[in-house]
Amino acid sequence: MAFPDPFAIDFAYELANQLRTLPVEARIALAEVLEAVAYDPVGSGVRYLATLPEEWRLMFFGDGAGMVAYVVSAKHRRLYVTHITWAG
């Protein structure tokens, strides 16, 4: 379900240094995918694990070289980015 206004995006504190050290192409690809996710947080990506609630999501970016995991809080209209992996 797409929303007219994007959800706010918060990053786990531990990701601050990792975000600064990502290559430029990774940061650009991540920003593009998170913008899309912010407008359609549950419709984007896939469920992180079948054993976790539907709000735990996973999405690939950068032609599959990156992965971002996030939790959707519809109540607070926020996305909480918990993990980023870049193998590019």
What feature does the model see in each segment?
Residues M1-P6, N17, I28, E32, ...:
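Enriched for short, Lys/Arg-rich terminal
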Residues R27, V42, L49, V81-T82:
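Short linear functional motifs in flexible/disordered or boundary regions
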Residues E35-G62:
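A short, surface-exposed loop/turn module that caps and links secondary-structure elements
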